[in-house]
Swiss-Prot record:
Keyword Transport: yes
Principal subcellular localisation of the protein: membrane
GO cellular component: glutamatergic synapse; inward rectifying potassium channel; myofibril; presynapse; presynaptic active zone membrane; protein-containing complex; sarcolemma
PANTHER family in the cross-refs: ATP-SENSITIVE INWARD RECTIFIER POTASSIUM CHANNEL 8, INWARD RECTIFIER POTASSIUM CHANNEL
GO biological process, one term: kidney development
The protein's role, per its UniProt record: Inward rectifier potassium channels are characterized by a greater tendency to allow potassium to flow into the cell rather than out of it. Their voltage dependence is regulated by the concentration of extracellular potassium; as external potassium is raised, the voltage range of the channel opening shifts to more positive voltages. The inward rectification is mainly due to the blockage of outward current by internal magnesium. This channel is activated by internal ATP and can be blocked by external barium. Can form a sulfonylurea-sensitive but ATP-insensitive potassium channel with ABCC9.
Organism of derivation: Mus musculus (Mouse)
Cellular compartments annotated: Membrane
Source organism phylogeny: Eukaryota, Metazoa, Chordata, Craniata, Vertebrata
Site annotation Role in the control of polyamine-mediated channel gating and in the blocking by intracellular magnesium: residues: 170
Annotated intramembrane regions: 127-138, 139-145
Name of protein: ATP-sensitive inward rectifier potassium channel 8
Length: 424
């Protein structure tokens, strides 16, 4: 929830509140780290003080495609309206200069008096009729009520010019709309990443892992994954580099970053000597000011357009000692994927030390696994003993209930005064 602002201005703070603030200084909360790449893949970067704004107009098509939809639709509508109005003024000026307006005012209606062949454009009596004729020419509606004659060469020139301008506007604006609807990042909306990344032991090595999946049946061809670590560093000369990017390799048996994304995959990076995570332990991870950026690229199978999906993981989103649960099962000869468990993780045994310490002391991993096995056996014993105790309590309660439901013996008195027990 958003923090509510104080109703009382700062210059009118009550004395008691001010005294409490002096006696109990507030602990300043740690500000959240600014992400370089948002979880949605958008770049969290603000461009300021750009002096040469005219460079955007030199590539006007890309500028129009990059605009928001509401701005694009406004420009789309205004471009046609402005062109219609501009040429409506030109048609009205042609009719006014040739005297067609006065001719129609004198004759009233067009008759068989030679007026039809004496005007530049028939039935252009006012600016409204000129505007309608401009729309008919540019959109090629062709109602037939207004038509151009051979009387004015200038009108023929205006007709040719309007057709050329109309074709240019149609090509640019319709191409812009098409490119916006077919942009590559639209396909990236169905490429999903796990919300958290994990660090666990795989094949005797500490590994950084995350999960990626595709919701569509149409595949991504030549899909590749790149991972970069972005953090603030300081050079030996004292220069502070706020955004230092470093590529980290992806563990792949074929020594390539290409993947076959037919089902959700767990992408693994082995933390070795080349990795920037080599000296980071579980305790150090919480205090690290780093961001792991993941970039998935590929070609859309249906359109052939190259698409790119991005996400990032900061230190708070990396879970140490967890692994992803399995979500792919085989059902009736078909592999089924349960996306409800896409980001679910379970806790596993993992050393809390860094990968460097693990390489220097391999016994740490053995001790961790032994402790995990012992704790697992103890939990199983406790669970079995609890089940045994619950079973014994249940049996005792059943016996008590059965004993309370036993039918008592009934005795009858004979006329002679003797007791005769009845058979139950």
């Amino acid at each position: 929830m958003l923090a509510r602002k104080s109703i009382i201005p700062e210059e009118y703070v009550l004395a008691r509140i001010a005294a409490e603030n002096l006696r109990k200084p507030r602990i300043r909360d740690r500000l959240p780290k600014a992400r370089f790449i948002a979880k949605s893949g958008a770049c969290n970067l603000a461009h300021k003080n750009i002096r040469e704004q005219g460079r955007f107009l030199q590539d006007i098509f890309t500028t129009l495609v990059d605009l928001k939809w509401r701005h694009t639709l406004v420009i789309f509508t205004m471009s046609f309206l402005c062109s219609w109005l501009l040429f409506a003024i030109m048609w009205w000026l042609v009719a006014f200069a040739h005297g067609d307006i006065y001719a129609y005012m004198e004759k009233g209606t067009m008759e068989k008096s030679g007026l039809e062949s004496a005007v530049c454009v028939t039935n252009v009596r006012s600016f409204t009729s000129a505007f309608l004729f401009s729309i008919e020419v540019q959109v090629t509606i062709g109602f037939g009520g207004r038509m151009m004659t051979e009387e004015c060469p200038l009108a023929i020139t205006v007709l040719i010019l309007q057709n050329i301008v109309g074709l240019i506007i149609n090509a640019v604006m319709l191409g812009c709309i098409f490119m916006k609807t077919a942009q590559a990042h639209r396909r990236a909306e169905t490429l999903i990443f796990s919300r958290h990344a994990v660090i666990a032991v795989r094949n005797g090595k500490l590994c950084f892992m995350f999960r990626v999946g595709d919701l569509r049946k149409s595949m991504i061809i030549s899909a590749s994954v790149r991972i970069q670590v972005v953090k603030k560093t300081t050079t030996p000369e004292g220069e502070v580099v706020p955004i230092h990017q470093q590529d980290i390799p992806v563990d792949n048996p074929i020594e390539s970053n290409n993947i076959f994304l037919v089902a959700p995959l767990i992408i693994c990076h082995v933390i070795d000597k080349r990795s920037p995570l080599y000296d980071i332990s579980a305790t150090d991870l919480a205090n690290q000011d780093l961001e792991v950026i993941v970039i998935l690229e590929g070609v859309v199978e249906t359109t052939g357009i190259t698409t790119q999906a991005r996400t990032s993981y900061i230190a708070e989103e990396i879970q140490w000692g967890h692994r992803f649960v399995s979500i792919v099962t085989e059902e009736e000869g078909v592999y089924s994927v349960d996306y409800s468990k896409f980001g679910n993780t379970v806790r596993v045994a993992a050393p809390r030390c860094s990968a460097r310490e693990l390489d220097e002391k391999p016994s740490i991993l053995i001790q961790t696994l032994q402790k995990s096995e012992l704790s697992h056996q103890n939990s199983l014993r406790k669970r079995n003993s609890m089940r045994r105790n619950n079973s014994m309590r249940r049996n005792n309660s059943i016996r008590r209930n059965n004993s309370s439901l036993m039918v008592p013996k009934v005795q009858f008195m004979t006329p002679e005064g003797n007791q005769c027990p009845s058979e139950s």
